[in-house]
Amino acid sequence: MKNKKLLILIFALLGIILAACGGSDEPAEDQANEEGTTAEESADSDSGFPMTISPTVTSSQNRDGSETYTFEEVTFESVPERIVVFDYGFLDTLDALGVEGIVGVAKDSSLPAHLEKYSADEYGNIGTLKEPLLEDIAALEPDVIFISGRQATFYEQLKEITPNVVFVGTVDDDYWNTFLASVDIAAKLFDKEAEAEEYLAKIDSALEEINALAENYDTSLVTMYNEGELSGFSTNSRFGYVYENYGFKPVTEDINASSHGSNFGYEAILDFDPQVLFVIDRTAAVSGNSNIKEDIENDIIKQTTAYKENRIVYLDGPLWYLSGGGLQSELAKIEEVLAELK
């Protein structure tokens, strides 16, 4: 009898314990899962950091080759929230990707029209492309400063403001690859890889179209117009991507590499006689006033195949000379050529 009462007591206690365990509105396992999810969300927000970013190039020289500047990798502990940008191509890419947090830009007279909104007072003025306002930049307390060739001489001084100074510029002899490298920097650092892939897909599609178009012509020449004078560019130049990436065949490779091209007389254009003649209007880009058609379409040029077959392609000066190196501007260049030659 005593044993029977003892068993009843044990079963009663077990029932109370089981009821207590099952009485919670939310199972203990679910509670643990919720806590785990919160931890995972926190981890996701910091995924990829610390992140080491490499410059688009590790060194560059000034125009006369007398000085060499070396650029270092930068390790970021988190996504930069206060961004200062000198390079307009990189600003173009940040704008295309919808990156927020830009606090300062170079408010130079050469600020591209499609980036005009950054001239507003809400964006701090960090000087010109050649003359940074170091004290004003320091006052912005940036987490990162993005530079290109014209600021190379100020690299060490800018690093005194923040160690996070990244070279994102393009270089003449490897323009397209350095452009893509700069896009990769923006996409990874600001978690915009999906947006970058979408934009690059548009560029790839446009490149396919322009390469197909370029197959129709055997020779071409890229030139730049400046106050009545012409200079020419081949594959080893800042506009070499017209040949290498767009697919146009150069009429000659024998042109000295220079950021402003090799001086050409109009007679040289007639001698080369390219089927397509590209003319970038530097005068319009720099001064806003240009007599390009009157100067180019002279009696000598009127004898060329390009003139006779209406294939002198006048390219937008501000876009080609001052802009470029960004997602929006590179797509716009391709679309301009397509519109002129289709």
Residue ranges and their predicted role:
Residues R82, K188, Q275-K342:
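Structured C-terminal subdomain patch of bacterial secreted/periplasmic proteins
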Residues L6, G22-G89, A194-L221, S287-N291, ...:
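Bacterial Sec-exported substrate-binding components of ABC uptake systems
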Residues M1-I8:
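Bacterial N-terminal signal peptides that target proteins for export
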Residues Q157, I161-E227, W320-K342:
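Extracytoplasmic substrate-binding proteins
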Residues E141-I147, P163, I269, D273-L277:
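Proline-aspartate-enriched helix->loop->beta-strand connector
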Residues R82-D136:
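A short, structured surface patch at a secondary-structure boundary
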Residues S109-H114, S234-G261:
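Alpha-helical, coiled-coil/dimerization segments enriched in small aliphatic residues
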Residues I17-A20:
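C-terminal motif of bacterial Sec signal peptides marking the signal peptidase cleavage site
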